[in-house]
Amino acid sequence: MILVNNPGSWAHIYWPLEHAPWNGWTPTDLIFPFFLFIVGVAMMFSFASRTALGATRAQLAWHVLWRSLIIFAIGLFLNGFPYFHWSRMRIPGVLQRIAVCYLVAALAVLAARRPADRSGRTGQRIAPVVVVTLVLLVGYWAAMTFIPVPGYGVGRLDPDGNLGAYIDRRVMGAHLWVQSKTWDPEGIMSTFPAIATVLIGVLVGEWLRSPRVPSGHGSRAARVKTAGLLAAGAAGLVVGELLHPFFPINKNLWTSSYVVFTGGFAMVLLGLCYWLIDVKGYRRWATPFLVYGTNSIFIFALSGLLAKASVIFKVTGPDSRGVTWHSYVYDKFFVPLASPINASLLFAIFYILLWLFLTWLLYRKHIFIKI
């Protein structure tokens, strides 16, 4: 997202680095659901390791709640920085959605856990998680399709006339994304299917941990895990495309077809990464992703803070007029190097490398900022 969110100029962007205008998808539209998916996968391994160390269900729930509150608060801080106009500050956001989805999905998982047996071991009931996931996806489709919106009618999926946008306006008023004004891409209604994205990751994580799946990286285990992920992922891609004519793939609405499609895509990517990294041992190419992942939310927040400061605070330009830090650096160091669209891309790549260097320093010193 750092690459996508920080071009040199918003007027010059290669199409894969832009979001789809409304229906449909681009590679950029895969990033957020992939992150939520992997949150679900990692959750199952984290809960298992904490439980093995003696953590109770209540302790896990408190940990999840505290972590969610911190992430949500960081998101609000980023939205308000630097002026904090509370009367019109945006309430939703990327980090806020991560916090809510993580919290609700984790509590659902914990509620579905089997009580400890005499030996102290617990187990995870999968059926309730599947049911919750299906209810979220089908219920969201039904609500968006059949509940009439005052002044617009029923079944509208355009930016202003859909049920989610109406609820956002009624509940949050002026506290919406400033560029859309009448709706929010991380709004209230679309958060429900986003929770399902995390739960799909939960199901995959639990399957990978299941005693019915061969453990380790031997040939049989590798075949089962890779084939399972690729097959399930391919099914998700096909089903998502089949649903598209009835409930279009749409990132802003986080439609049910979008959840199934991106969930399938994420499983395929996870299967390929597992095969390349864990089975074949091709690890070096993934080092930058590993380094970024060790402090992902911290770096996302800090890079967003600096990016926002760079377009607010000004310096004196060559003509003695005030220009933003962002414009000054871009115009002076990148515009002379290439065509406008390539100069814009070079700026974004430079920004990525800058934060990769900082993250690498933290990684080398084993500094991992836990949230």
Where do the model's predicted regions map?
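Membrane-interface helix-loop-helix modules in multi-pass inner-membrane proteins
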Residues: 47-111
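Functional transmembrane helices that form membrane-embedded active or gating regions
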Residues: 227-235, 256, 279-303, 370-371
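Kinked, hydrophobic transmembrane alpha-helices enriched for aromatic residues
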Residues: 1-11, 70-82, 239-243, 293-314
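A conserved active-site cap/scaffold subdomain adjacent to cofactor or substrate pockets
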Residues: 183-211, 219-239
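Extracytosolic (periplasmic/ER-lumenal) interhelical loops and adjacent juxtamembrane/interface segments
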Residues: 8-25, 145-187, 314-343
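Membrane-interface transmembrane-helix boundary segments in multi-pass integral membrane proteins
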Residues: 25, 184-194, 251-263, 267, ...
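N-terminal signal-anchor module of multipass membrane proteins
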Residues: 1-60, 296, 302-303, 313, ...
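Membrane-interface helix caps and helix-loop-helix hairpins in membrane proteins
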Residues: 82-92, 245-256
